[in-house]
């Protein structure tokens, strides 16, 4: 993988970049739609490709259980299995193990947990996490980390941070040993990211950042945010870590993805984002519009003949009214969720295009002013 910073914004850490992957060029700042189980929910892959989306996220934890890494490998890897021609970033599954799995127990070797599918006990290690993602053929592989809950005691935060560093070292060693064996393309084309932990303790975050940079990764992710902490504390962590990290490497904030949060974090120098909100909110009947979020299930939209957003050119906005989509959702028709999901993802994609355009034209400050205080729900 190669990352290029094309242009920086004066008076800000915001930057325009380009990520070169084995499956195409990804322009940054970039938002990754979440395809947890090898699909972005309620969306055809071709629709994402037609809208210029180049990078999506999948999760090794979920794929480990269903259909299984070995099954996907038999199909030729994750790209072939899911019919996706763009790039894929896979999460190691650490967050899901700690947050979703019952009977989770941590050891120096890794984390032991109970399968949500058949109840068997499994062990996820830094080595097995790397192996699984490499066998999937991921363009960007994430190291295994220990994501502590919020709030956590100082002692627990320190232990999780040290464990994350040790696991990152072991993951990097495995990566170096295995990549040429598993990848048919030149190994340098693929990349390994380290994940920075430390809760909202900025000193621990800097300590973790420094140690991961000593190990050396192709990119750096800030994990363990959006787990209940106040947004102001999240933002402070991102600001501190982003200003400390190597400027030549891509920076990724994991799981934080409200539009106004993305704008704030782009201003702090972040390049990559992911979040389940666009499709999750769609499944609950909500749509992103220029003014904020509207809840189409509300009775006031029953006879509304206007499109979801008059400034949007997506298929849902071109062809259908708010009233019709309201009807679909109330009738529990799948089409309603599909239309809202695509609309919301294209809202995000359009936002990222606007961000890149304003950065390219040296007008980032103007764009930032437009988004001030945008946290509206209707």
Curated annotation (Swiss-Prot):
It catalyses: 7-aminomethyl-7-carbaguanine + guanosine(34) in tRNA = 7-aminomethyl-7-carbaguanosine(34) in tRNA + guanine. InterPro entries: ArchSynthase1/Queuine_TRR, TGT, TGT-like_sf, tRNA_ribo_trans-like. GO terms for molecular function: metal ion binding; tRNA-guanosine(34) queuine transglycosylase activity. GO terms for cellular component: cytosol. Its cofactor is Zn(2+). Residues 279-283 are annotated as: RNA binding. The keyword Metal-binding applies. Substrate binds at residues 91-95, 145, 197, 224. It comes from the Bacteria. Gene3D superfamilies: Queuine tRNA-ribosyltransferase-like. Zn(2+) binds at residues 312, 314, 317, 343. NCBIfam families: Q_tRNA_tgt, tgt_general. Homodimer. Within each dimer, one monomer is responsible for RNA recognition and catalysis, while the other monomer binds to the replacement base PreQ1. This is Queuine tRNA-ribosyltransferase. The lineage of its organism: Bacteria, Pseudomonadati, Verrucomicrobiota, Methylacidiphilae, Methylacidiphilales. The gene is tgt.
């Amino acid at each position: 993988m190669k990352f290029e910073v094309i242009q920086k914004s004066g008076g800000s850490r915001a930057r325009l970049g380009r990520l070169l992957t084995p499956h195409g060029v990804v322009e940054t700042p970039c938002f990754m739609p979440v395809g947890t189980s090898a699909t972005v929910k309620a969306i055809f892959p071709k629709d994402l490709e037609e809208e210029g989306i180049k990078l999506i996220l999948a999760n090794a934890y979920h794929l480990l259980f269903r259909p299984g890494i070995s099954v996907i490998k038999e199909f030729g890897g994750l790209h072939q299995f899911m019919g996706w021609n763009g790039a894929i970033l896979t999460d190691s599954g650490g967050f899901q193990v700690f947050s979703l799995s019952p009977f989770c127990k941590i050891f120096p070797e890794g984390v032991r947990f109970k399968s949500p599918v058949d109840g068997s006990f499994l062990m996820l290690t830094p080595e097995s996490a790397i192996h699984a993602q490499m066998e999937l053929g991921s363009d960007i592989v994430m190291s295994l980390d220990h994501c502590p809950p919020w709030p956590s005691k100082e002692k627990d935060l320190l232990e999780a941070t040290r464990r994350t560093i040790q696991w990152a070292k072991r993951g990097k060693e495995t990566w170096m040993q295995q990549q040429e064996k598993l990848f048919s393309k030149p190994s340098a084309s693929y990349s390994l990211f380290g994940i920075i932990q430390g809760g909202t303790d900025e000193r621990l975050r800097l300590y973790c950042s420094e140690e991961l940079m000593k190990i050396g990764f192709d990119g750096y992710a800030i994990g363990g945010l959006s787990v209940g902490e106040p947004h102001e504390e999240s933002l402070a962590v991102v600001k501190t870590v982003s200003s400390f990290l190597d400027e030549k490497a891509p920076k990724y904030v994991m799981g934080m993805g409200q539009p106004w949060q993305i704008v704030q974090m782009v201003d702090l120098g972040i390049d990559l984002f992911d979040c389940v909100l666009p499709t999750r909110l769609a499944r609950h009947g909500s749509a992103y519009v220029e003014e904020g979020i509207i809840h189409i299930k509300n009775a006031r939209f029953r006879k509304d003949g206007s499109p979801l957003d008059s400034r949007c050119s997506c298929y849902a906005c071109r062809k259908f009214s708010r009233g019709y989509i309201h009807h679909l959702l109330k009738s529990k028709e799948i089409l309603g969720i599909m239309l809202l999901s695509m609309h919301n993802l294209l809202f995000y994609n359009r936002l990222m295009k606007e961000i890149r355009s304003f950065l390219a034209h040296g007008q980032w400050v103007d764009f930032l002013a437009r988004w001030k205080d945008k946290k509206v729900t209707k």
